[in-house]
Regions:
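Alpha-helical cap/lid subdomain in secreted, periplasmic
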Residues: 26, 81-209
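Bacterial N-terminal signal peptides that target proteins for export
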Residues: 1-9
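Serine-esterase "nucleophile elbow" of acetyl-processing enzymes
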Residues: 21-75, 79, 83-92
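N-terminal start-of-chain detector that recognizes signal peptides
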Residues: 5, 42, 68-70, 138-140, ...
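C-terminal motif of bacterial Sec signal peptides marking the signal peptidase cleavage site
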Residues: 17-19
Length: 209
């Protein structure tokens, strides 16, 4: 009898543990983009902006999601933090895609300052019970290998420390490829935006399921 009871408890605990360990799907209906010119649609007509393409991609896949683009060309992490309160006033936001930091790197802002700003942004967003997808950036070597190392460590560390969703590099498959960038070699062209949209869509669908 004792053996039967122990077996019952054993299997009950297994079922309970497995049930608790499954990550619950997220209900996402409204997404806000918080970034700089890499996400704002710099140099492109409005119908080619990331918010339009990403929303279309998601809708065509059966996800009724609205995308609002609050990215501003030239913004640093400090600028994003300064206008965050206005962004948090947008009603019924389920997810914010945070893609700031590229201009910090171009301006040589100390990585610890960028990290501090992004951490404050993340904390304030989480306080509103809004999910975050952190889109990482990578530095060039123009400011030295030490700067690059410190900058590149910002995003994975923030993701880990805050337990938030993470897409390691916003410009994955786009950066340094002339076929996917405008003549300045920095900002994505329409084909580049489409690739970014595909990559972000995969991350969004992954956190919904």
């Amino acid at each position: 009898m004792k053996i039967k009871i122990r077996l019952y408890l054993f299997f009950f605990l297994i079922v309970l543990f497995n049930g608790c360990s499954e990550k619950q799907p997220k209900e996402i209906k409204k997404i806000v983009l918080l970034g700089d010119s890499l996400m704002s649609g710099y140099g492109l007509s409005s119908e080619k902006h990331l918010d339009k393409i990403l929303q279309k991609d998601l809708n065509l896949s059966g996800y009724k999601i609205t995308i609002i683009n609050k990215s501003v060309s030239g913004d640093t992490s400090s600028d994003g933090l300064a206008r965050l309160d206005k962004i948090l006033e947008i009603k019924d936001t389920d997810l914010i895609i945070l893609g700031l930091g590229a201009n910090d790197m171009l301006q040589g802002v100390a990585p610890q300052k960028t990290k501090k700003n992004l951490q404050e942004i993340i904390t304030n967003i989480k306080n509103e019970n809004i999910e975050i997808l952190l889109a990482g950036m990578k530095a060039t070597t123009s400011r030295g290998l030490s700067y690059k190392k410190k900058f590149d460590e910002i995003y994975p560390e923030l993701s880990k420390n805050n337990d938030i969703f993470f897409f390691p590099f916003l410009l994955k498959d786009v950066a340094l490829n002339p076929d996917f960038n405008q003549s300045d070699g920095i900002h994505p062209n329409f084909n580049g935006v489409k690739i970014i949209s595909i990559n972000l869509k995969k991350s969004i669908v992954g956190l919904i399921k």
